[in-house]
Amino acid sequence: LGVIVVRTKRETNYEEKLSKRVKTSGCAQGTSFGDIMENFEGVKLPETKIKTSWLYSLGQKINATPSLYLAAGAIHGSVLCKGNHPLAYMEDVGRHNAVDKIAGHMFKRQILPDDKILYTTGRLTSEMVLKTVQMGIPILVSRSGFTAWGVQLARQANLTLIGRTKGKRFLALSGTQRVDYDIDPQTIPGERTEIQRKASR
């Protein structure tokens, strides 16, 4: 059994943190410890808008990006975007790990979050929403669906939450007033089948 001891300059009451347990809505009903929800209460993300043309463009660009998913499947991806431009693409077997890699990328390069979009392949659960809010990113997009608590927390934090993005379709359940319908979806070409993995997505 390996043991790692970490000492910090700041004192922390671990017993108090462990007593504050929050059941999450993700895989196997996880548990978050500490004052994460207390810190969440005062968060209000900026009123950053997103254009529907960006959604369509990002979907096409991300789907065409060479990746482990296209090669083998069974991989989650997270993409940091600005407007309709993907800035960083991270993959991992775990959807949370892929998001954490984006967080680390932003921290190391001191990237400001206010005008960014986080695009993920994972479900929009409470944990995904909490992580995105902690990162300060005002827009979270996924090709997957939602959980009820994830939507509730997104609305509380002023996070724009968009799921079920595929081709010309998407569903916005939080921050709908910040979605700018700037393009007719009928003018968007369909997804190219030659970039799909085994003819399916």
Predicted regions and their residues:
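Phosphate/diphosphate-binding loops
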Residues: R164-T165, P189-T193, R197-R201
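Intrinsically disordered, low-complexity regions enriched in acidic/Ser/Thr/Pro/Gln residues
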Residues: L1-K82, A88-Y89, R201
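Conserved active-site and cofactor/substrate-binding residues in soluble primary-metabolism enzymes
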Residues: V22, T31, I50-S53, S57, ...
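Short, Lys/Arg-enriched charge-dense amphipathic segments
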Residues: E11-K23, M90-N97, Q134-S144, T187-R192
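Feature captures the catalytic cores and cofactor-binding loops of soluble hydro-lyases/lyases
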Residues: R95-L173, R178-P185
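Generic structural motif recognizing short loop/turn segments at the entrances and edges of beta-strands
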Residues: L1-I4, H85, K116, G167-R169
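Protease-associated
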Residues: A74-R109
